[in-house]
Amino acid sequence: MTDSITIALSKGRILEETLPLLAEAGIELVDDVKKSRKLVFPTTDPNVRILIIRATDVPTYVQYGGADLGVTGKDVLMEHGGDGLYEPLDLNISRCRLMTAGKKGEQPPAGRIRVATKFVNLARRYYAAQGRQADIIKLYGAMELAPILNLADEIVDIVDTGNTLKANGLEPRELIDHISSRLVVNRASMKMKHGQINPIIEKMSAAVERRRDS
């Protein structure tokens, strides 16, 4: 399978919303991901396999050729930097917002600010672009605790409904960007396997447009 195609996905919402789009490109999983501990899955197309990995690892696997294609959130791409990746398609799924947030009714300090986030590079660029000095604190989860315990003045995190912020006495402040999942392709694979990859992109793009028009 020298010309086989490897697609990197992550478990959760992105996987669930990507599988129907892949199905319209003729690619369906043979096994049930939820019932298996495997990380590499065959599909109904004998020349295509799917990797199930951490969401934050998808750009890295695609960049360095561990996978030819991948689906990941724009937030992850912004944090990763996108080097060595071709981003041909916004899949318009897993939509949310990347925002700053802090204690309800409180204003952020005028001077140096402490910010908790898992998006360290992204947050550093964002505050620098605003001309604000920020100490970025790396956390891996439960961002809402940081302002509550005075670990940070603000957080930078993904916001969907905003209910989690509200339940913890926080409120969204500034919108950094609208986020959705993107199809990314290894640049070398796009050249060497164009004949196999381009039809996948075209069929998924058509599926996205049909959903947009429905």
From Swiss-Prot:
Xref: CDD domains: PBP2_HisGs
GO cellular component: cytoplasm
This protein's record includes keyword Cytoplasm: yes
GO MF, one annotated term: ATP phosphoribosyltransferase activity
Catalytic activity: 1-(5-phospho-beta-D-ribosyl)-ATP + diphosphate = 5-phospho-alpha-D-ribose 1-diphosphate + ATP
Keywords: Amino-acid biosynthesis, ATP-binding, Cytoplasm, Glycosyltransferase, Histidine biosynthesis, Nucleotide-binding, Transferase
Subunit structure as annotated in this protein's UniProt entry: Heteromultimer composed of HisG and HisZ subunits.
PANTHER family per record: ATP PHOSPHORIBOSYLTRANSFERASE, ATP PHOSPHORIBOSYLTRANSFERASE ATP-PRTASE
Functional note: Catalyzes the condensation of ATP and 5-phosphoribose 1-diphosphate to form N'-(5'-phosphoribosyl)-ATP (PR-ATP). Has a crucial role in the pathway because the rate of histidine biosynthesis seems to be controlled primarily by regulation of HisG enzymatic activity.
Record protein name field: ATP phosphoribosyltransferase
Annotated gene: hisG
